């Protein structure tokens, strides 16, 4: 990172270059079927500490134009000055109206920051390689089973490939 940043209340990661090694094992279940999933575990470097991660994902396609998935990951991070445990859960929905028009949704919870994020993207590929995006984001503080809105953002984006 170019600037120092805080990842725990008392732990700041200094600016600088970091190299990580990571070892991962995983298994995928029926990735082209109506119901699929994945289990994985990994261990490796994380800035100047190390991280264990265990994750699971389940995906369901009730019909070809709708995909629903749930993800969970547990991260245990150890640093010389402390440890952190984070639980991250997410739910996704992908609606394919046509081959050129997609609406994607993501809801994610992070126990370390006690936040819930919502992201909705409407994507229109009006020409091969050229897309318009309408993006809606909200971030909530999740404390004591109550959600408090912290931020709302609406973005319009355009992307295009120019050939010459």
Regions picked out by a protein language model, each given a short descriptive name:
Residues 1-164:
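Exposed, low-structure sequence patches enriched in small/polar residues
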């Amino acid at each position: 990172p170019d600037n120092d940043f805080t990842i725990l209340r008392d732990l700041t990661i200094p600016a600088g270059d970091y190299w990580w090694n990571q070892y991962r094992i995983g298994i995928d279940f029926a990735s082209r079927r109506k119901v699929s999933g994945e289990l994985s575990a990994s261990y490796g470097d994380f800035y100047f500490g190390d991280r264990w991660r265990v994750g699971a994902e389940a995906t369901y396609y009730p019909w070809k134009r709708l995909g629903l998935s749930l993800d969970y990951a547990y991260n245990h991070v150890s640093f010389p000055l402390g440890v952190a445990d984070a639980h991250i859960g997410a739910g996704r929905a992908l609606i394919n109206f046509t081959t050129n028009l997609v609406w994607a949704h993501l809801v994610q919870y992070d126990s370390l920051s006690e936040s819930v994020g919502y992201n909705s993207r409407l994507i229109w590929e009006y020409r091969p390689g050229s897309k318009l995006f309408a993006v809606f984001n909200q971030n909530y503080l999740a404390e004591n089973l109550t959600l408090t809105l912290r931020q709302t953002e609406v973005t319009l984006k355009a992307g295009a490939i120019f050939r010459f």
